[in-house]
Amino acid sequence: MRFEADTHSHTLASGHAYSTIKEMAAAAEAKGLKALALTEHAPKMPGTCGLFYFQNLDVVPRKCGGIRLLMGAEVNIMDETGRIDLPGSGYSYCEHSSAMLWDGAHRRGKYESIRGCDEETVY
């Protein structure tokens, strides 16, 4: 199987990665990818980007070398209603997102979280 895009990556901006956008784009191009989604952590994650970062994504070029860049976020689903930790004023600048369940699911435990998904309710 040949992959054409990496849809989940972090740069220095997320606080725990080690590469710049330019370095990551060069590595993606060297691997033969066509696109790279930069999905920095949303503000709820300690030590990561603030809202200001997401509100300024429109100034980042959408191409670096031969790689198409997709600006995005790794958001956290905060509760059963599907509320996420990136307000619309930041999320509206994102072209791509990935999501994870926040600590409410961890507190309830694995069984309850799975059962909740079976009932079409996000926990």
Predicted regions and their residues:
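Non-catalytic positions within long, well-ordered alpha-helices that form the structural scaffold/packing
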Residues: A25, E29-G32, E119
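Extended substrate/RNA-proximal surfaces in nucleic-acid metabolism proteins
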Residues: T48-Y123
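Hydrophobic "anchor" residues on beta-strands that sit immediately upstream
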Residues: R2-E4, A35-L36, L70
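Divalent metal-coordination and catalytic microenvironments
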Residues: H8, A28, E40, L69, ...
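Histidine-centered catalytic micro-motifs
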Residues: E4-G15, L38-H41
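Short acidic/polar active-site loop segments enriched in Thr and Asp
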Residues: K34-A35, T39, E95
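Aromatic/hydrophobic pocket-lining residues that form π-stacking "cages" and hydrophobic walls in ligand
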Residues: M24, T39, L57
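Glycine-rich anion/phosphate-binding loops
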Residues: H16-T20, Y111-E112
